[in-house]
Regions:
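Nucleic-acid endonuclease domains
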Residues: 1-46, 51-159
Length: 159
């Protein structure tokens, strides 16, 4: 599965797990969306970014350590505003399987990391898998909804 298709697949896999409360905010042009999923809760809209990486690529296994994009984004409808991270939280998905057993479609083969946006390094454009293992909450697919809810609830209480 190529990177673009895998990214869309993982976004939709997570969206299906978090439905019906979380929805995709875009109607037809999701490439321009500033976040991947959103939900209304407590009078506000919570926004979620989903990032993914996999060791197995179409050309074979990658040996370099994975990095996940967290760069601030510009809202092209408001070019006068500086770029920023628009989501409240990030879900990072890592697929480490290689060889014939690797199946990007299998949620059980993915490891997920949940991080509040404000916990991300403010001056970095990417984070490594090592950083996520040290600083984010690692979960399996089935635990993702509960851990994400807990992280966002804790974040809301700190405001």
């Amino acid at each position: 599965m190529n990177n673009v298709l895998r990214g869309e697949y993982v976004e939709n896999m997570v969206a299906a797990l978090l439905a019906p409360h979380w929805v995709q905010p875009w109607k037809s042009n999701h490439e321009w969306s500033l976040w991947d999923l959103e939900r209304k809760r407590g009078g506000r809209t919570e926004k979620l970014e989903i990032k993914q990486s996999a060791r197995m690529q179409p050309w074979g296994p990658v040996r370099s350590p994975p990095r996940f994009d967290i760069a601030p984004k510009r809202d092209f409808n408001r070019l006068d505003e500086p770029p920023c991270r628009r989501a409240d939280a990030y879900v990072f998905a890592w697929h480490a399987e290689v060889g014939d057993a690797a199946d990007h479609r299998d949620p059980a083969q993915w490891v997920f990391f949940v991080a509040a946006t404000r916990s991300l390094p403010p001056d970095q454009k990417t984070v490594s898998l090592g950083w996520l293992r040290r600083n984010a909450t690692q979960v399996g697919f089935d635990q993702l909804p509960a851990v994400l809810d807990a992280a966002l609830t804790q974040m809301t209480r700190r405001r």
